[in-house]
Amino acid sequence: ISKQIQHLTGITNQRVQKAPYFEDVAQTIYNLLADTIFVAHNIYFDYNFLNHELMRCGLPSLKIPGIDTVELAQIFLPTEPSFRLADLSESLGFIHENPHQADSDAEVTGQLLLLIEERMRKLPIITLEQIARLSSHTGMDTSRFIYHVLEEMKENPEPLDLSLEIIDGLALQKKEVELFTSVHYGERTYPRKKQAKEKMFGKTLMYRKEQNRLMNAVYDHFTKDESKDLMIEAATGMGKTIGYLLPLSYLATPEKPAVISTVSLVLQQQIMEKDIPLLNQLLDQPIQPVIIKSYRHYIDLQRFKGTLVEPPGQKQYALYQMAVLVWLTQTKTGDLDELHLTNLNHAFFADVAHRGTGFLARNQSFYKQDFVRFLQKKIKQSNFLIVNHAFLVQETQRKEPLLPASPYLLIDEVHHLPEIAEKVNDKRLSINYFHKQIQQLEEPNQLFDRIQSYLPKEHEALRWLSIYREELSALCEAQICVAEGLMNLVSSKQPNGQYPEEVMMTKEMLDQLPLESGTAMDHLQLFYQEIQQLQSQMRLTFEIIQESWTNQMRIDLASLYSLFDQLDKQYLLMDQWLEDWRDHLIHWFVPGNTAQQMIFHLHDFQAAMLPSTVWYPRYDRILYIGGTLKIGPNRHYLSKRLGIEAAPLKVIASPYDYEKQARIYVPKEAPAVHQVSNQAYIDYLETSLTGLIEQEDRPILVLFTSHDVLQKVYQKMHLSMLEKGREILAQGFGGSREKLLKRFILSEKSVLFGADSFWEGVDLPGDALQIVVVTRLPFDNPLRPMVKARNAYLESEGINPFYQESVPKAALKLRQALGRLIRTETDRGVLLILDRRLVTAKYGARIIHALPKKVPIKELAMEEIYQDIHEFLKKNEEGS
């Protein structure tokens, strides 16, 4: 038995020394299986493996039926975050002492099957009937099991649960908007003093001096301050969220709601499910919150029902359909994120995602139950609206605002806002995606044909539609011509004729294009202008005609108008891309292998300047809060990036004793990265990380600045570490970022290798993570085209890109890495930085100055570091 399997199962070579050979017991096993139903978690592996071994021993192939509990769990436990047997056991409260050991796995699989059957029997019969019809796509005999349970339920039907209703064949949770009723008449008094807060908190919350300062600062800003903007730096883990929610609860009403923006969907959920319920235990006027997300996060019931009428016949699609049928009996929000899926790019979600209320018709079966309409009603009865930064920033791009004006906007985790604002405002045009979309609309019985069929006697409208289709075809050809000209220009400048991954365009390069390419650009702009005129004319014509149309016809018209809006944006993008050469706009493209695969991008380095956004003037007061806002003595780095340099900054003293709670280590033998070969550097990382992982039996997060280096170190280490019982999870291997984080959080001693986004927003409880390794100081690669372009822009603004941008950004990332470790006054954490530039380079002193004061930075040999880390973390476990 290999070491890897020994660690996985706990079964050693010693234990099996006297065990019989499979050949000796094969006949017994075969006889035991006769007339049984084979149940397994991922039956395809177990059944086929066992069958192969039995046949090897000369026995006939198994013919017994089989049931797969993985597929059953995916269908009947749709909101579980993971379907691995160990994770399900933990989530459902099963005792699973020996994961991957046959007897323990079998017992837990049996418990899981019984629980799933119990859940199935609680479903409405109509739901199970629909699942049964789709279940032919499940493996082995799982479908027979579903039909068996259904038949038994039909023999003794139970009345429909009172919380459910049947609408047009779908069983749904009943929903009611909770009306906001003010418990108090007149003013409530905010508890400013320590004594008043202690009385209010009782035994539910502990009074904290720093949190009290934060609460009063928040209340004062929204009631007294003259300045519109205020920044507050408050350490993570000091009760920051409760610290701003409580004072706002004394001010916010549904007419003047508090809008709270945080960095991610996960943190939105955390505020909703953890922080507000805790605070509501203390308040005599409870907060009534609602999470607001873009429409596409919600399911459109009418569209989902449509997928059941004509199922596409693909297995994963059917599994999603069945899971959603179960989920609809549970959800009151229709928020697809409740399904914890990491692949929302599947065709199923494109088919069922909501597109907005403009696509609904009043006489549709599900109009009254529509989740987005329900959300809009809830917003009117809520005094706290919880959004994320991307949603907030997108307000600038919306025709109609989705957020109300208010006196109160609070932006949490504000240090993420500049990057998110720039990313959201990065305009792009994928020629391939657009052409496929137009081809689909041109297919028989698709949108254009359907619209045409609605106009049998409307000759003018038919003529406009015919011309419009011709113009779209000409536009697609013009796009290809322009793309070909740009690609020829770029390849002519490359020594090998190859295309780089990203190409930054300048006006000078555009002027070098040959005459025919210049003509193609003129044609492209002309087609866009003509399409604009046609769309305006068609809107006027259709507004008159559509009054006599049916609801389905109007929904198709809404789809056509959606295409119009898309082309309006496309025109603005390409017009800017070809004509607008202001310094802060970066024109670039991704070539692809052919002209049709080209993607145009327009990036705006001033997108994070808040005063120029649509939403900034709609709020009387804005408060910006985060754990790391100032960088050493530089108090205006972030406010400058946001265009609000005059905003005052208040710093709430950190409650943590970094001298006792944290250590930063820099190995004396760490190589100077630029002075050794790439292979020598990778070997050094492998040696350093192996020593640490072998010694410390706890979760470790390793942060890289290069995907290439990450992959090479992972490939060198992961098998040898697995044999020693340590699993390395790595970005780019084994699933999405969300899936990797989920597995890392659920495991007790995994190692996670991450780059890019793993530096940001890895939200783990302090006690779940005590060691972070930084393989190299987190500077952006200066050779990357976008970094070069940003540096050139900063220089044009009179800013030193290295000292005023790169160094502060690197310092901010290191502070955030340290902030992941220390979240309570009892946490201990270690930051191991395998880059000596922190202590040898001139700018290293600036970075150190930006880190918390008194955090010890130790330069030691690697072996001494291992020993010191072990002793430091062990002290914490011993309670000293």
At which residue positions do the language-model features occur?
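Conserved RecA-like P-loop NTPase helicase motor core
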Residues: 667-679, 732-837
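Signature of the SF2 helicase/ATPase Hel1-core->accessory helical subdomain module
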Residues: 269, 274, 357-384, 388-530, ...
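A substrate-engagement module of RecA-like helicase motors
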Residues: 194, 255-256, 262-382, 787
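Conserved pre-motif I regulatory segment
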Residues: 181-232
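Acidic two-metal-ion nuclease catalytic site recognized across multiple nuclease folds
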Residues: 115-193
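Conserved non-catalytic scaffold segment of RNase H-like nuclease domains
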Residues: 1-65, 78-100
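Walker A/P-loop
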Residues: 224-246
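A contiguous, basic/glycine-rich beta-loop/short-helix subdomain that forms a polymer-engagement track
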Residues: 356-380, 393, 398-400, 534-670, ...
